[in-house]
Structure formats: structure tokens, C-alpha cells
Amino acid sequence: MSELTKRLITGAVLIAVVALVAWIDNFFLTWAFFGVIYLFAFYEALGLFDMKDQNSLYFWAAALWIVAAFYPNPDDLFFIALMIFAGYEAYTQDRNFKKFLPFLYPTASFLFLLSLYHDFGMEALIWLVIVVALTDIGAYFNGKAFGKHPFCKTSPKKTWEGVIGGVLIATIVGSYYALMLVDLPYAIVISFLTSVAAVFGDLFESYLKRRAGVKDSGNILPGHGGVLDRVDGYLFAAPAMVVLLRGLL
């Protein structure tokens, strides 16, 4: 089976699963779906941070996600976890602050992702998916067609033309969809800034992979690499959208 065939089959399965979860639109199903993705992403992040021997962190990651199902503001839990970790470090004088990295990335972002659904509903999640997906797709095709100027050294294949084209397409389509949720000025601002955040979410994961000396964050998704390779844009875009919706509406 060719790499392209694997990529297409995996992509089709992922789209079908996401569509089913969106159609059912049940909080605990969505929480469980995000939870599975989160734990795989957490595992991959440990690899990128060179911490695969820290098995005890999985327990705390799972415990935090279980609490998030019942706590009214899931993103608050990141700050509570930070205080607990700081207290533990002070008490034990362990001084291994690296242990907190996977709770900063990707944990905090997944808590914001759950908060987006909890506070603003499935419509907002679909808005997020539209913006992030079109930012990525638009950047790819515009970069192929018009790309001449490299965006940055962290991701050599990205071009300014591709990034700008992707952000513009995501902003236009995202704003049109968002009219069912917010007024046009808010739709434009939120779509634009969320798209920009997605660009840097992708860039940050590329930076982590470059530092770790790996091409992909994992290999669980045939033809696509790891979970983080698929959700990197969402990990910056979700917090951005939550903050913007809370601040502007």
C-alpha cells in the first residue's frame, strides 16, 4: 500500500469519526474523544521532551482529565495543577521542573479545547475546525502555487505566500460560518487571530520535533505520523478562540 493510499484512508477514517462525534453532540462522548487524543498526544510530547521514562506522569494526566469532566471551567485546572506542582517541587526540592512541560503542552491546550465545547457548544468547535483546517490546507496549496519567500528557518517548507493565503482563506470562510454565532466584525477578528494562532501552533510543534531530531511526533496514524502532527494547530488555536470569545462577547 502506497503512502498516499495510507494517508487517504487514515484521513477518511478520522473525518468520519469527527463527523460522528459532532453529529451526536454529547458532552461525555466529546470529553472521551478528546481524552483519547489527549493521552496519545501526552505520550508523544513526553518523547519530544525526552521524558519517556516518566511513567508516573500518565496517572496525573488521566486524573486531571477525569476531573475536567466534572469541573465547570476545565481550563482553570491548568493553574491548579501548576500550583500543586510548584508546591510539590518546593516540598521535595526535586528541582526537576521539566516534569511540568507536558502539562503545559499539550495539556493546557486540551483543557481549553474542552472549555470551548463546554462554554460555546459544538458550533464553536466546528468553527475552530474550519479555521484550522483551512489555514493548513490553504497554506499548502497557496505555497505550492505561489510560494517564493521562506517563512522561517524552523519550518523551511513554509512560505510567506502560503501562510498569508491560508490565513486569508480561513478568515473568509470561518467568518461566513461564524455569522450564525456572532456579528460580522467579531467573526472576522476571531477567525483571523485564531488562524494566526494555528500557524504558530504548527510552527511550535515543528520546533519541538527539530530539537528532538525526529520527522514525526509518532507513527500511530498511518501516512500522517503522530497525533500531535494532526492537532498541533488546534493546540494554539483553541486557547486563542476561547480567550477571544470570552473577551469580545
Report each predicted region and the residues it spans.
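Short helical (or helix-break) motifs at transmembrane helix termini and adjacent helical loops
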Residues: 134-144, 198-210
